[in-house]
């Protein structure tokens, strides 16, 4: 597929989201949405993230409904291993009391991991299949059909995940400390004298906002760079296979690690929100 484009066109095509927007003439897609700005929807990110989320729910619900007290099957043993792994991390890290944290951590870890693992799919496969479908079903030029299959390479998705965590941080901070306690935390730390309230407020606000920002940018940056390297390797022709293999093997470690880091930072931030300083 790379031979059909120049190198820059190939990279741009594979890093472009399938976009949908509303115009004066109705619903438009891709290049027609170049000026839509904030009101453009990345439909591939939505489709893949929702689809992988449903896959997670289906698998775990199926295993839970068929779980036995006897010798577990391979799938049940794997799911139990994942659940115990997440639960142990929650118990050792989260010091508050909430039944929500463990299920939240499990959902974040598995969902982000599944989205990250899409990075191991050959970079040309999904765009090529999407181009064939677009051409056969809708008469579209395959070069104008986009399908970026790794949702975590979309800054919109990583910021959406981080925003959800940020809302929970605010919720637990106010729930555990009250509005007055939360306000005191923002204005009386790290310096306890009232004269330092403006300085404290600036420092604590920056610290608070840095948490979701770092969550979103860390996940996006690592996965975007990873996908870009896969695409660059694909442009070198037949010599790409050993490099693809080595980079994919390396990613077997990196992709779960990024999901784990996102989960652990979420637990840590929520634990800090529940602590009374």
Swiss-Prot record:
Annotated localization: Cell inner membrane
InterPro entries in the record: ATP_syn_F0_a_bact/chloroplast (IPR045082), ATP_synth_F0_asu (IPR000568), ATP_synth_F0_asu_AS (IPR023011), F0_ATP_A_sf (IPR035908)
Keyword entries, A-Z: ATP synthesis, Cell inner membrane, Cell membrane, CF(0), Hydrogen ion transport, Ion transport, Membrane, Transmembrane, Transmembrane helix, Transport
Membrane topology term: Multi-pass membrane protein
Chief localisation class: membrane
Residue stretches spanning the membrane: 40-60, 98-118, 154-174, 219-239, 245-265
SUPFAM superfamilies: F1F0 ATP synthase subunit A
One cellular component (GO) term of this entry: proton-transporting ATP synthase complex
Gene Ontology BP annotations: proton motive force-driven plasma membrane ATP synthesis
GO MF term list: proton-transporting ATP synthase activity, rotational mechanism
PROSITE patterns linked: ATPASE_A (PS00449)
Function comment: Key component of the proton channel; it plays a direct role in the translocation of protons across the membrane.
Assembly and binders: F-type ATPases have 2 components, CF(1) - the catalytic core - and CF(0) - the membrane proton channel. CF(1) has five subunits: alpha(3), beta(3), gamma(1), delta(1), epsilon(1). CF(0) has three main subunits: a(1), b(2) and c(9-12). The alpha and beta chains form an alternating ring which encloses part of the gamma chain. CF(1) is attached to CF(0) by a central stalk formed by the gamma and epsilon chains, while a peripheral stalk is formed by the delta and b chains.
PANTHER family hit by this protein: ATP SYNTHASE SUBUNIT A, CHLOROPLASTIC (PTHR42823:SF3)
Family according to the record: Belongs to the ATPase A chain family.
Protein name: ATP synthase subunit a
Species of the source: Alteromonas mediterranea (strain DSM 17117 / CIP 110805 / LMG 28347 / Deep ecotype)
